Regions:
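Conserved phosphate/anionic-ligand binding catalytic regions in large, soluble enzymes, centered on
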Residues: 52-74, 171-185, 189-191, 344-356, ...
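Ferredoxin-type iron-sulfur electron-transfer modules in oxidoreductases and energy-metabolism complexes
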Residues: 34-52, 80-84, 88, 97-102, ...
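Hydrophobic alpha-helical positions that pack around
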Residues: 137-263, 275
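Short acidic, glycine/serine/threonine-rich loops at helix termini
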Residues: 63, 68-71, 95-98, 137-142, ...
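Short amphipathic, charge-patterned alpha-helical segments
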Residues: 112-116, 262-280
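Cofactor-/ligand-binding subdomain signature composed of acidic, glycine-rich
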Residues: 1-51
Length: 431
């Protein structure tokens, strides 16, 4: 029998407590007990990786790659310098979960990174924090100082042979630096542009050394897994989607915000947690994982569950868990214009298909909104999107194509109306 899924604060467990970001608060809820246990009992990296594999934890930044498998690529036995990086560079519209983990529970990120460093043999770590959030960067620096003072960072941690230094790195606000190799280039002081792969960061990362990059929420999940066991984490979710996930719900809801829930919860219940659709309006469509995941119509979304397989079944994906709610007053043409402008502005310009294609997409949609569109523009948008997708070094080209293709697929009638009449078919959007 299925167990009802519910809110479960795991990465955000200190939120709501007094002085949540302090090390004293974290220690009061059992913080740093996982790394203490590892160092005291000298648990092998292989044992820990196996536990993470059992947990079913998948990368929480968007790709959803199995964490245990990714960590196994960087062997603890390899000698020399290695790096571990927390990717807190969330810059896609609708994403704001990592900011709250840093704000309320920075020490759980630190402990997760320490465990990762122990497993993979890394001696230096960075938390790459998005350039447009300043207070959280300062807060994380304070947390590092607290951890050092308590003997959790530096040399011979907790009297063991384990050495690990951690640094906060403030990014420059570029969305592209959320891509792991562009992030590495930025840390090295270069222009943030993706690298060709292979070689992958696990063999050639920061300064040519083996490097592991994982999302903030991924690292913050690790201490709980070590303390409670991989099977317990897996059981929180559903098969192929173990654990909890923070969903950032925004758009036309009464109570927008971050909601950490057990994976497998019906979307309808998540929407209820967010207060339902605002102003008594009807739900029209949802972007379930951020703009780089396909749009889903209301009737399909209301029967879906919030997990990897549940969203895949309705033609979308979990992504970073950025749930954008659109009510029946939303003009899909104008919404797509905003999203296409974002991808156009954030293209790093390295790859011709993305550099030129995102500009084409935005300009064509803009002329439709300006009342100058032609029916042929719909075929042009599809054609350009398909020519951008799969032809770039990183996935930004694919991401830019996704909303275009899914918006037109589900709401082509709105685009045709806009082209024929030079205005939106949604009442009030032309005022």
């Amino acid at each position: 029998m299925d167990v009802k899924k519910k809110p479960f604060p795991l990465c955000l467990q200190t939120a709501g407590l007094s002085n949540p970001a302090s090390i004293d608060t974290y220690l009061s809820i059992g913080g740093y007990s996982a790394i203490k246990k590892i160092l005291k009992e000298k648990i092998s990296p292989e044992t820990l990786i196996n536990e993470i594999k059992i947990s079913g934890l998948r990368g929480r930044g968007g790709a959803g790659f199995p964490t245990g498998l990714k960590w196994s690529f960087m062997s603890n036995g390899t000698k020399g310098d290695k790096y571990i990086v927390c990717n807190s560079d969330e810059g896609e519209p609708g994403t704001f979960k990592d900011r709250d983990i840093i704000r309320y529970n920075p020490h759980q990120i630190i402990e997760g990174m320490m465990i990762g460093a122990y497993i993979m043999g890394a001696n230096v770590g960075y938390n790459y924090i998005h350039g447009e959030i300043w207070q959280e960067y300062l807060s994380f620096e304070d947390a590092i100082d607290e951890a050092k003072a308590a003997g959790f960072l530096g040399k011979k941690i907790q009297g063991s042979a384990f050495n690990f230094d951690l640094h906060a790195f403030h990014g420059y606000g570029a969305y592209i630096c959320g891509e792991e190799t562009a992030l590495i280039e930025s840390i090295e002081g270069k222009k943030g542009q993706p690298r060709f792969k292979p070689p992958f960061p696990a063999t050639y990362g920061i300064y040519g050394k083996p490097t592991n990059v994982n999302n903030t929420e991924t690292f913050a999940s690790i201490p709980w897994i070590i303390n409670n066991g991989g099977q317990a984490f897996l059981d929180l979710g559903v098969p192929n989607s173990g654990g909890t996930k923070i969903f950032s719900v925004s758009g036309h809801v009464n109570n927008p915000g971050n909601f950490e829930i057990q994976l497998g919860m019906p979307f309808e219940e998540l929407l209820s947690l967010a207060g339902g659709v605002w102003k008594g309006n009807s739900l029209k469509a949802v972007i379930p994982g951020g703009p780089s995941t396909p749009l889903v119509k209301a009737e399909d979304m209301m029967g879906a569950t919030m997990d990897y397989d549940g969203l895949s079944k309705i033609g979308s994906s979990l992504g970073a868990g950025s749930v954008i709610i659109m009510d029946d007053t939303t003009c899909m043409v104008q919404a797509l214009k905003r999203l296409s402008y974002f991808f156009y502005e954030e293209s790093c310009g390295q790859c011709t298909p993305c550099r030129e294609g995102t500009g084409w997409i935005y300009r064509v949609i803009k002329r439709i909104v300006n009342g100058e569109g032609k029916i042929e523009d719909l075929a042009l948008l599809k054609d350009v999107s398909q020519k951008v997708s799969g032809r770039t070094i990183c996935a930004l080209g694919d991401a830019a194509a996704v909303p275009v293709l899914s918006f037109i697929k589900h709401f082509e009638d709105e685009f045709r109306y806009y082209i024929r009449h030079g205005r939106s078919m949604i009442k009030g959007e032309n005022d």
